Amino acid sequence: MLEIEIVYGLPDRQVLKTMQLAEGTTVRTAALQSGLDGIFENLNLHSAPLGIFGKAVKDDTPLRDGDRIEVYRPLLIDPKEARRKRVQNQEE
């Protein structure tokens, strides 16, 4: 058995869940079994980008004991555009 963590967060709420899974479980399978989509109603675990310890991974990546799966949210604004707006606001 593997013991892993899965995390998801919004600006006002974060959840970290510990799970016991069988050897050979993939990152996507673990995400789907986590039940996070029942806690966060707009979360689609079938398509949300996933990572392990800050690095994006493919859906079929097998998990290792102690891994932390991160469920990523889509960007609301392009980082370059956000920087441009910050600079523009500072100049005003």
Curated annotation (Swiss-Prot):
It comes from the Bacteria. InterPro entries: Mopterin_synth/thiamin_S_b (IPR016155), RnfH (IPR005346), RnfH_sf (IPR037021). Coiled coil: none annotated. Disulfide bonds: none annotated. SUPFAM superfamilies: MoaD/ThiS. Pfam families: Ub-RnfH. Belongs to the UPF0125 (RnfH) family. PANTHER family: UPF0125 PROTEIN RATB (PTHR37483:SF1). This is Protein RnfH. It comes from Neisseria gonorrhoeae (strain ATCC 700825 / FA 1090). The gene is rnfH.
